[in-house]
A protein has these predicted regions:
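Single conserved hydrophobic/aromatic residue that forms the stacking wall/gate
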Residues: 1-13
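Short, structured coil segments at secondary-structure junctions
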Residues: 8, 88, 111-112
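Divalent metal-binding pocket/active-site signature
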Residues: 11-88, 99, 106, 139-143
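Mid-to-C-terminal alpha-helical segments outside catalytic/metal-binding sites
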Residues: 39, 131-172
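Thr-Gly-centered strand-to-loop micro-motif
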Residues: 49, 72, 93-96, 118-120
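Short, acidic/turn-prone active-site loops that include or flank metal/cofactor-
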Residues: 75-76, 96-100, 121-124
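Short, motif-level signal for alpha-helix interfacial/capping segments enriched in acidic residues
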Residues: 96-112
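Short acidic/histidine-rich active-site segments
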Residues: 114-126
Length: 172
């Protein structure tokens, strides 16, 4: 905490998670994640998570830490994994890779607008194209999708009153 000082969590809470493919020590990753989740919870910050072949361990850590809000960045999981995350009130963010995978496209289609984000990450595809393709996949007008994602952003990142992951006062 002393290292962060008055700077806050900045990028610490934005890019945390688990990657069980790249060979980094799993115990070290879990330890770092626990620290980051604790700090985010103490400061009331949402967490944006990177998850590569570590869905179950990551879900266990989230259950133990109960962060204010959770967004799975670059989600490329199965529809079942999406259902598990969505049932906890977490949000899913999809990008260009979504459209190359039938299972991830099914996960996008099953994600409620109130729990959806879109991203480019490091893709050269413009965000406008990702919005257009996602709107088509979900069968909604692009303007409806844009408004829903803007509402999600405001709810999670601009200081609303939260009552658990992905929920604000008044949500049912």
């Amino acid at each position: 905490r002393d290292v962060l000082g008055s700077r806050g969590l900045g990028d610490v809470y934005k890019r945390q998670g688990l990657d069980f493919v790249r060979g980094a020590d799993r115990a070290a990753q879990l330890s770092a994640l626990r620290t980051q989740l604790r700090l985010a919870r103490e400061r009331g910050l949402p967490v944006v998570l990177h998850c590569v072949r570590a869905f179950e361990p990551l879900m266990r850590e989230l259950a133990a830490s109960e962060p204010r809000a959770v967004i799975f960045h670059g989600f490329i999981g199965s529809p079942e994994q999406a259902r598990q995350a969505l049932a906890k009130g977490y949000c899913l963010s999809f990008g260009e890779r979504t459209f190359a995978s039938p299972k991830t496209l099914a996960a996008l289609r099953g994600t409620p607008l109130s729990q959806l984000f879109l991203e480019t990450d490091d893709s050269p595809v413009p965000i406008a194209e990702i919005y257009a393709r996602a709107a088509e996949a979900k069968g909604v007008p692009e303007e409806v999708l844009q408004r829903a994602i803007l509402d999600n952003y405001k709810r999670i990142f601009t200081g609303g009153e939260y009552e658990g992951p992905g929920r604000t006062k008044g949500d049912k």
